[in-house]
Amino acid sequence: MEEAETDATENKRASEAKRASAMLPPPPPPISPPALIPAPAAGEEGPASLAQAGAPGCSRSRPPELEPERSLGRLRGRFEDYDEELEEDEEMEEEEEEEEEMSHFSLRLESGRADSEDEEERLINLVELTPYILCSICKGYLIDATTITECLHTFCKSCIVRHFYYSNRCPKCNIVVHQTQPLYNIRLDRQLQDIVYKLVVNLEEREKKQMHDFYKERGLEVPKPAVPQPVPASKGRTKKALESVFRIPPELDVSLLLEFIGANEDTGHFKPLEKKFVRVSGEATIGHVEKFLRRKMGLDPACQVDIICGDHLLERYQTLREIRRAIGDTAMQDGLLVLHYGLVVSPLKIT
């Protein structure tokens, strides 16, 4: 009985397996390499073409073994499209970040500007520029701005010229402008004066009106503005003429420093020498220097002036150029010939 049941079970399983195998689709035929077919003879029909056989590139459906490759191509195309979209999104995000940074920068710039949006230049208050356009002598705006070439400080022309009547130093930094002729080292600053006239409203008109009224009240002729002269045809001749005007003669090459060393009690009253820097001709003698000292100090005729250079008592006939050549650099100080002078009572008055 058991053997009969076992055989029935195996038969049942075999019948189920046959039924399941019958339901599966038949396997595809194997693909064989194309055979070399000889060319058909004349009048015979050849084999079907590749397009008729369902080869790739034809209008018919592809064989089932090529379908997975086509599906992979589609997926690959989708991934490439997705990568391009990601790159475009990243570029757009970078552009948006740059635009935000520029907007913040423009906001910072606009916060420092004036209220007017159309006005790009920053307005400056005149009070900030006032120290640069004022004369430190008269405390007013610069008129005929004149600059000292040694220190580049600028003043009104009339103020600085009046100051040099009693001093040879810059009124602002106290530097020595020139030992004897400080007016040699000043120049008109036309550019700065134009700036002052443009900054201060109606300053030029008021100055011209005051000058006109000044001359009119005193019955004087109002000076006309300077007109540039036409340049002559011969430039070489003009250059020579200018050199002859502005060139210092060779004999005016000795600058003196006169130092007072003392006076006897019997010399009486005398005025101190106000300016000890003197520029004279190299051909001038010690006698000329003595006359200069007598006139400036108001000395009595009986008072004798002794002039010394170094350890040498100088004679009246000696010229300054000879003294400088004979004594040498020991008598010089910063390019100046140093002369010491003293006052004594003449021996003729004692007898």
Swiss-Prot record:
Biased composition (Acidic residues): 81-101
Entries under InterPro entries matching the protein: PcG_RING_finger, PCGF6_RAWUL, PCGF6_RING-HC, RAWUL, Ubiquitin-like_domsf, Znf_RING, Znf_RING/FYVE/PHD, Znf_RING_CS
Coiled-coil segments: 69-110
Database matches in Pfam families: RAWUL, zf-C3HC4_2
GO cellular component, one term: PRC1 complex
Biased segments, Basic and acidic residues type: 9-19, 62-80
Biased composition (Pro residues): 24-37
Primary subcellular site in the record, as a coarse category: nucleus
Post-translational modification: Phosphorylated during mitosis.
Annotated region described as Disordered, given as residue ranges: 1-114
The keyword Metal-binding belongs to this UniProt entry's keyword annotation: yes
Localization of this protein: Nucleus
Role: Transcriptional repressor. May modulate the levels of histone H3K4Me3 by activating KDM5D histone demethylase. Component of a Polycomb group (PcG) multiprotein PRC1-like complex, a complex class required to maintain the transcriptionally repressive state of many genes, including Hox genes, throughout development. PcG PRC1 complex acts via chromatin remodeling and modification of histones; it mediates monoubiquitination of histone H2A 'Lys-119', rendering chromatin heritably changed in its expressibility. Within the PRC1-like complex, regulates RNF2 ubiquitin ligase activity.
Subunit-level organization: Component of a PRC1-like complex. Interacts with BMI1/PCGF4, RING1 and RNF2. Interacts with KDM5D. Interacts with CBX4, CBX6, CBX7 and CBX8.
This protein's name: Polycomb group RING finger protein 6
Source organism per UniProt: Rattus norvegicus
Gene: Pcgf6
